[in-house]
Amino acid sequence: MSSLYVKLGILAAGLMLSGCMQSTTFEATNQTVFKPRDKELLAKVSYVKTPVPEAFRRAIVDYHRKEAPGSIVVDSDNHYLYLVQDGGKAIRYGITVGEEAMAWSGIAKIGSMTEWPPWHPTPGEISRLGVPKFVAPGPDNPMGSRALYLYSGGKDTLFRIHGTNQPEYIGASISSGCIRMTNEDVIDLYNRVKMGTIVVVLEPKHGDSPFNSQMALQGGGNSIQ
């Protein structure tokens, strides 16, 4: 029985570190966010539209960190991305985390935004995955329906938040890639943010460490219009 209490305590601590408490309101996708091209291409996907586990469905949750409303916060450890709202709330999205996502942390800004982006694989990806140097935009492109390109100090960090053609991995860590969201969720996020939005990428495996807490104080954010 004592081991059960220990497990429950660990779970509660994880929820605290991920910035959410018990209040959770799941959000259905508003179909008005989809443009005609979105509807056309999403209808053509060849991958299986695996339902996202309930824990990683888009939801409005209580949020207790200090980032300003309008900021994006990426919590790689818990596979969540938060869009901070007013009133101690945030929109929480489930994400897939890859090695590239675990390799960078800090504060960035959205420096570019693209609908249905092409994919330019890195030399390592070309060698490892056997993919071409260029993959055109489309329903089965690994970049998915939207991409947010993160910049720091005026330079591209090579860190992206984008859609996916593998929604079955939402809530998981995989061998490569940046931050992936379902195509529907990344469209929703894309429509809520703008160029210059602050993105705080928490240091993996450190939870609410002094480093991450200091980033929270530095993160500015932009109010959602």
Describe each model-derived feature in a short phrase.
Residues 2-8, 14-225:
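N-terminal pre-domains immediately preceding structured catalytic cores
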